[in-house]
């Protein structure tokens, strides 16, 4: 029962049987349309962003498993805010403001790869990334917003 793994980078939600997927998976003789459909379903949340995809194929049974990685937190934040670059001077130059609901959305997208045990801690991790990007969170310094999360100010938004 030999398994092969193919790792590729695709645009979320828009994989096609053509390159880079087709040439990489074609030699294994698996149903390409089934693979493409599953990749597109699993990566739909990351539409427009490059996402790492890992396809594990059993050579004997032609069965496959698809694992979708997540883009870096900085990429998700920039996509949500529609900005192209973070600040060159994060402490002095604030380039955008991340609303708490978008911080929660990003924390949910990244939750499996974050170190957080719950969404509250995940949102704080996303806010920590905002510090190094030169962003404010809900109009405040991200460190202040993290303190507000600890104090329970956003509990109504952060409910499961």
From Swiss-Prot:
Keywords assigned by UniProt, alphabetized: Ribonucleoprotein, Ribosomal protein, RNA-binding, rRNA-binding
GO molecular function: large ribosomal subunit rRNA binding; structural constituent of ribosome
Disordered as annotated region, ranges: 137-160
One GO CC term on file: large ribosomal subunit
GO BP annotations, alphabetical order: translation
Comp. bias (Basic and acidic residues): 138-160
Coiled coil: none
PROSITE patterns associated with the record: RIBOSOMAL_L11
Domain of life, source organism: Archaea
Database matches in SMART domains: RL11
InterPro entries xrefs: Ribosomal_uL11, Ribosomal_uL11_C, Ribosomal_uL11_C_sf, Ribosomal_uL11_CS, Ribosomal_uL11_N, Ribosomal_uL11_N_sf
Job description of the protein: Forms part of the ribosomal stalk which helps the ribosome interact with GTP-bound translation factors.
Family of this protein: Belongs to the universal ribosomal protein uL11 family.
Quaternary structure (record): Part of the ribosomal stalk of the 50S ribosomal subunit. Interacts with L10 and the large rRNA to form the base of the stalk. L10 forms an elongated spine to which L12 dimers bind in a sequential fashion forming a multimeric L10(L12)X complex.
Name of the protein described by the UniProt record: Large ribosomal subunit protein uL11
Species name: Methanobrevibacter smithii (strain ATCC 35061 / DSM 861 / OCM 144 / PS)
